């Protein structure tokens, strides 16, 4: 407010002067030239005095303000003295700390200078992560703070000694540098130690990569397993494709399906045996057996491929023994392993086969039992009997294999659990087939109802197979089984 008032006064004092000058100036310029010169001089002198007076007035105000400040100088001096007494310590401390930090910063910040002195140390420090630099800086700052505190105490006690101490850290700077270099050596060792986990980290990365490779290996193993799955299928096909033993194994399967398996196909199997055993089964030699087996393999393969086309059941059931090739092979090998037992049991089967042969004339003549069995099929569907008879004419193995996988799917477990009991069970069935025939015919009828149209298509697909199969099968039924 004072400034505003002063400015207003200045304006009021200044504004009338030019008006006066303007008013009087034409007079001076005009007629009153000579007189007015003196007046002009007087007025100029007055204006100059006013200006000087105003200037002096302003200076006096300024001086008054300075005087008020000067009057308080004593108290301010006391405050300034106390502040100066308090302030020089942090200022001196700051100067000392800055002097101490300057060489240390020169030492810590440029690692290139360290490389000049310690090239062997600097080379790992180049690889040192930034965190370790920060840790080193923190440690150096800790030492600097301790050193600065020591210097502060010395400054407070002896200002002259502080200068010596200030000069001494410059003198001691190589020692500090050596200490810091030792710390840096230790830090480099630490960094090397940290580099070692970094070096170990490639090992971990290798382990991770190995693990990543292992899933690839696992994938390869899975792929191998997937490759093994076709190998399993191939192995499942191999015992069907291999010439003598595997075909005999399939003959064992056929024989077991005819003789050992306690299923409703067994009486039909016996019907097949009774139909085919009188068809000169004894005229075949072992060589004919081997030739017929090898010749019968290819139609078997076709037949194995074709029951997949028959129905979903047969496809699933034919797939099951392929998914269980080793199990079936083990089950096939099991009767080989207790060969003496099987030989001991096979005479029984021969005896029963004799009984079968005793029954076969009735079966050729369609004895009442078997004829009752077959009309049971005819009662269900006359086409079924025709189809089954055509299948018996074309390939009995087709008939064995089409429901055979059902037998395998259900009976392999029975063979796993009780491989030996499979042999006496058919004796019970041969002794009393009529007791189990109704269930047998019901299940056979179910199988036959599931397959009628597709079974019709099968004999059309296999026109040229029947002779070979008729040659191959009867040997595979009884005699190959007896030979084992």
Swiss-Prot record:
Phosphoserine: residues bearing it: 123, 159, 181, 188, 201, 349, 353, 363, 367
Gene Ontology CC entries for this record: nucleoplasm
Sequence ranges of Basic residues compositional bias: 61-79
Extent of the signal sequence: none
Ranges of Basic and acidic residues composition bias in the record: 1-25, 306-320, 413-428, 438-447, 454-463
Induction data: Down-regulated during megakaryocytic differentiation of K562 cells by 12-O-tetradecanoylphorbol-13-acetate (TPA) (at protein level). Up-regulated in normal PBMCs by mitogens.
Name this polypeptide is given: Hemogen
Source organism phylogeny: Eukaryota, Metazoa, Chordata, Craniata, Vertebrata
């Amino acid at each position: 407010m004072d400034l505003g008032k002063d400015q207003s006064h200045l304006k009021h004092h200044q504004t009338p002067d030019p008006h006066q000058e303007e008013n009087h100036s034409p007079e001076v310029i005009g007629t009153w030239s000579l007189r007015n010169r003196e007046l002009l001089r007087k007025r100029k002198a007055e204006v100059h005095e006013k200006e000087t007076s105003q200037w002096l007035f302003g200076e006096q105000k300024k001086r008054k303000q300075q005087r008020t400040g000067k009057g308080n100088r004593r108290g301010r001096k006391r405050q300034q003295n106390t502040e100066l007494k308090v302030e020089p310590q942090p200022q001196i401390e700051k100067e000392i700390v800055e002097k101490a930090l300057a060489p240390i910063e020169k030492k810590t910040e440029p690692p290139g200078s360290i490389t000049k002195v310690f090239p062997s140390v600097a080379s790992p420090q180049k690889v040192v992560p930034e965190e370790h630099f920060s840790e080193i800086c923190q440690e150096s700052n800790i030492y600097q703070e301790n050193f600065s505190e020591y210097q502060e105490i010395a400054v407070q006690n002896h200002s002259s000694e502080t200068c010596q101490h200030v000069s001494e850290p410059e003198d001691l700077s190589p020692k500090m540098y050596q200490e810091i270099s030792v710390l840096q050596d230790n830090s480099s060792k630490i960094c090397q130690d940290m580099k070692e986990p970094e070096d170990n980290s490639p090992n971990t990365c290798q382990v991770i990569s190995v693990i990543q490779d292992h899933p690839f290996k696992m994938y390869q193993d899975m792929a191998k397993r997937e490759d093994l799955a076709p190998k399993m299928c191939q192995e499942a096909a191999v015992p069907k494709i291999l010439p003598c033993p595997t075909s005999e194994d399939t003959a064992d399967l056929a024989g077991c399906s005819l003789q050992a398996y306690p299923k409703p196909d067994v009486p039909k199997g016996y019907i097949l045996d009774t139909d085919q055993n009188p068809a000169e089964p004894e005229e075949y030699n072992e060589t004919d057996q081997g030739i017929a087996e090898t010749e019968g393999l290819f139609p078997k393969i076709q037949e194995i491929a074709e029951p997949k086309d028959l129905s979903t059941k047969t496809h699933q059931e034919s797939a099951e023994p392929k998914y269980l090739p080793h199990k079936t092979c083990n089950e096939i090998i099991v009767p080989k392993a207790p060969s003496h037992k099987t030989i001991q049991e096979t005479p029984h089967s021969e005896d029963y086969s004799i009984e079968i042969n005793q029954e076969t004339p009735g079966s050729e003549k369609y004895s009442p039992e078997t004829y009752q069995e077959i009309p049971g099929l005819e009662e269900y569907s006359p086409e079924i009997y025709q189809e089954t008879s055509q299948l018996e004419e074309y390939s009995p193995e087709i008939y064995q294999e089409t429901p055979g996988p059902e037998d395998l799917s259900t009976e392999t477990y029975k063979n796993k659990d009780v491989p030996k009991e499979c042999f006496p069970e058919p004796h019970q069935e041969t002794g009393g087939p009529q007791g189990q025939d109704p269930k047998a015919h019901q299940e056979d009828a179910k199988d036959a109802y599931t397959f009628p149209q597709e079974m019709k298509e099968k004999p059309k697909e296999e026109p040229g197979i029947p002779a070979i199969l008729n040659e191959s099968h009867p040997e595979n039924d009884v005699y190959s089984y007896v030979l084992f």
